[in-house]
Amino acid sequence: MAQELMFEEPRRGKPPRHLADFDAEGRASAVAALGLPPFRAKQLAHQYYGRLIADPRQMTDLPAAVREQIAETMFPNLLTAAREVTCDAGQTRKTLWRATDGVTLESVLMRYPQRNTVCISSQAGCGMACPFCATGQGGLTRNLSTAEILEQVRAAAAALRDEFGDRLSNVVFMGMGEPLANYARVLAAVRRITEPPPMGFGISARSVTVSTVGLAPAIRKLADERLGVTLALSLHAPDDELRDTLVPVNNRWKISEALEAAHYYAEVTGRRVSVEYALIREVNDQPWRADLLGKRLHRALGPLVHVNLIPLNPTPGSDWDASPKPVEREFVKRVRAQGVSCTVRDTRGREISAACGQLAAEGG
């Protein structure tokens, strides 16, 4: 039986408030409520975003007498690493996190020669019900708070610095969940990821990618924020008949609406849109679908689009499989023939279920 779409999270308790949930005004108010001088707000933000410290007991520039109080009121331990697994000769690491209410989620840290990327979750589970995705099949548990999202980024940045003497360069909202279904918290997280310390982590907006299955009104809204992040549209089919099944949100917003919203995003931001297409053997890999994909994208976005073909990653209980390499090569050739840039994504983490569509937060 097909999963139902879920745009609203089930009602459940909220995570405790954390420094990372607050903007500058909120931090000032929280510090004032503790009876501390205003400069402590900036000091705490610098420790968290600049020095990547999440435990006030390690903040030696704070008076010892207030560290415990600050720890209890502004730095709850939101996420605990329940399990870590690695592959790709240690270059890919998947972390299973457990939140304070027992909810689990996953993030993936990937090291490349020229960049370091963390793939983060915006929801525990996902309500978009895509049948080829392990996360979507599990349903939506709840939205993550802004701080829970940012803690995944801070932990990755701290691990890179402490273990490898390196810096985090890229953040992709391609883990568990539909980012634009948790719009306000994801937006706040993006702002803090891109603002320079002490207001944020100082990662270039051009190095932040927000993916979506095609929530057209939210794509337009994100464009109007003018943040300059990369938009990744998970399309997976060029025709509504197939996409209605592969990406059920297509029953709400058709391909034409998603592409019109993507065009608006490209027009407003000047940024090229990335289109994600999981290539599934004998499902969406036919030559005519490659031709149609190229034509529709060229018509809608011109040069402001790039197609990432993703060989389907296996998920438990699924009979679907990745397309053979010759089919993949022909698909790329046909999309390019329509004047659209197209490459096959380097898939990392498949053997530890850390690749696209495999995150399910099981075990731990």
Swiss-Prot record:
The active site is at residues 106, 356. The lineage of its organism: Bacteria, Bacillati, Actinomycetota, Actinomycetes, Mycobacteriales. Its EC number is 2.1.1.192. Belongs to the radical SAM superfamily. RlmN family. The gene is rlmN. It catalyses: adenosine(2503) in 23S rRNA + 2 reduced [2Fe-2S]-[ferredoxin] + 2 S-adenosyl-L-methionine = 2-methyladenosine(2503) in 23S rRNA + 5'-deoxyadenosine + L-methionine + 2 oxidized [2Fe-2S]-[ferredoxin] + S-adenosyl-L-homocysteine; adenosine(37) in tRNA + 2 reduced [2Fe-2S]-[ferredoxin] + 2 S-adenosyl-L-methionine = 2-methyladenosine(37) in tRNA + 5'-deoxyadenosine + L-methionine + 2 oxidized [2Fe-2S]-[ferredoxin] + S-adenosyl-L-homocysteine. InterPro entries: Aldolase_TIM (IPR013785), Elp3/MiaA/NifB-like_rSAM (IPR006638), Methyltransferase_A (IPR040072), RNA_MTrfase_RlmN (IPR027492), rRNA_lsu_MTrfase_RlmN/Cfr (IPR004383), rSAM (IPR007197). Reaction proceeds by a ping-pong mechanism involving intermediate methylation of a conserved cysteine residue. Its cofactor is [4Fe-4S] cluster. This is Probable dual-specificity RNA methyltransferase RlmN. The keyword Transmembrane helix does not apply. It comes from Mycobacterium marinum (strain ATCC BAA-535 / M). It is an enzyme of class 2 (transferase). Residues 112-350 form the Radical SAM core domain. S-adenosyl-L-methionine binds at residues 177-178, 211, 234-236, 313. Disulfide bonds join 119-356.
